[in-house]
């Protein structure tokens, strides 16, 4: 890699994190957002955060969660990460993520986003799907979702797995991407692996990074095929770190079991290709695999998840179990 990357608040060794450097004086900050924004872009920050800092915050509530046709609240942010410069990696640890509402909403919206119905962009001869709004009850201290289905004479009771659909930095250049879009900046990836205990790596394109988050889901199946998860509000605790001089092209995710790469584009096959190439290069650069050995490893060990197949860009997650990687 040439000159050693200078690391602020964290040291990267073969893809694993060590104890933060002793000179980092972390603070715990509490932040209650007042209003959301519709795009991921460079704008006046709502909070300034130093590497190592912990932020206790929450997603935004509003009419969307409480009534038919209610307004979407937008994204929280941006947080300005002190010391972040283009070519760094922003490391976002999700220390805690919990629902803080007694209900969640999932909708079928005619002409909007769905993996199995026509949308507003393409004219079709078949009729749109009917509009439906399902209100799930959140019970047992936020651990179980319950939905009565009177048309089917059935009742669903399922364990919940809270996640954040959207984590992002400001995109490259002067671009502003709407909240529905995922891309190399993160955004609306709808990856169910972005949950408590996960660490998300995002490329930095601007001084300060400009971090955003939102779109809490109490639960979501792979693909998000109807166009929404169990949409609800969340309490979340982040810790922010920087890896100076470590340049990545696309988002990465880690947890105790897996390293993961995310590709977001259409068609779906290209999203898979992006995530696969990113994983091969991660093994090559950080775990010191020879390139074609890395490809063979990915070919036999990778698990692939369609995170979403409904957004303007589709998203695919490629996962490699850590137990097969060198320590």
Report each predicted region and the residues it spans:
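Intrinsically disordered, low-complexity linker/loop segments enriched in Gly/Pro
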Residues: 99-196
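Conserved mixed alpha/beta catalytic, RNA-binding, or beta-rich assembly cores of soluble enzyme
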Residues: 160-269, 280
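Short, Lys/Arg- and Gly-enriched loop/turn segments at beta-strand edges
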Residues: 62-73, 97-108, 208-218, 307-310
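Bacterial N-terminal signal peptides that target proteins for export
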Residues: 1-9
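Bacterial N-terminal signal peptides
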Residues: 9-19
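N-terminal, Lys/Arg-enriched amphipathic/low-complexity engagement segments
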Residues: 27-68
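Short, structured beta-strand/loop micro-motifs enriched in basic residues and often containing a Trp
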Residues: 31-41, 69-75, 177-185
